[in-house]
Regions:
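Catalytic centers of nucleases
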Residues: 10-11, 15-84
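Acidic metal-coordinating catalytic centers involved in nucleic-acid phosphodiester chemistry
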Residues: 1-8, 59-252
Length: 252
């Protein structure tokens, strides 16, 4: 079937990555300055003064029952990226590393032990489970990741995993819209959906331009300025007449 050549999962994954970058940028803009980049050090990276503060791996699954286990390719491919970045010095040890996925973390798994917070977070247990997975698996595709992990001393593994956070069961690429609307509630109480459409319209073009013509990332100030412009344009005394609004909605 010609459908075997389809790239829908990959395309959805890229769109998820772009939307997730915007969502995290809005959230981080409340507490710190940054420059956000896509497809440089990681899927998404936040830097301050040229130093990476946080890197994100975004994993989107079209399967509603996807689970992250100790042998999941998504987990080990992510760890390999971070291990290579650590070895090269491009991603320092102290950088926060986030694996954000629509899949669930299997109970009792290493991913379950690497959650954001709470009693379930247990770095030593995660390190032990990952060592067992790496030494017992016969998956040839993941062998380079296993070898890179096992090349570290036990203390080095735990030091790395202390900066690794797995955030499972996240909204999918379409459902992120609701989270964006919640984050932009202050922009316009009566036009939340429109404010998201306007911001994303700018964001997708801005990301594309940055990927084609790299300029060192997208600074927080630029995102804040765009949100402020949208907020001003959606004030009652600045709203366009109905015909103009309809035309804008069609264009978006």
């Amino acid at each position: 079937s010609i459908s075997t050549f389809g790239a829908a999962p990959s395309m959805v994954g890229y769109l998820y990555q772009v939307r997730l970058a915007l969502l995290w940028a809005i959230r981080r803009s409340r507490t710190s300055d940054f420059v956000v980049s896509l497809e440089t050090l990681d899927d998404v990276s936040f830097e301050v003064g040229g130093e990476p503060q946080a890197v994100l791996q975004a994993k989107h699954s079209l399967k509603t029952t996807a689970n992250l286990t100790d042998l999941s390719a998504e987990l080990w491919k992510t760890l390999r990226v971070w291990l290579v970045g650590l070895a090269s010095g491009e991603i320092p040890l102290g950088t926060a590393r986030f694996l954000i996925t629509t899949a669930a973390a299997a109970p009792g798994s290493a991913c379950g032990a690497l959650g954001i917070e709470g009693r379930e977070r247990d770095v030593a247990e995660a390190a032990k489970r990952l060592k067992h997975a790496a030494t017992s698996s016969i998956n040839g595709e993941l062998k380079p990741a296993f070898e890179a992990y096992l090349a570290l001393e036990e203390t080095e593994r735990e030091a790395l995993l202390a900066h690794v956070y797995v955030i499972p069961s996240q909204p999918d690429a379409a459902e992120i819209t609701e989270q964006l609307q919640s984050e932009l509630y202050h922009v316009s109480l009566n036009h939340q959906a429109l404010s998201v459409q306007m911001l994303e319209g700018w964001w997708f073009k801005r990301v594309l331009n940055e990927l084609v013509h790299p300029e060192g990332g997208i600074p927080r100030a630029e995102i804040d300025a765009q949100i402020s412009d949208i907020q001003e344009s959606l004030k009652p005394d600045a709203l366009p007449i109905d015909e103009d609004l309809d035309a804008l909605m069609i264009a978006l």
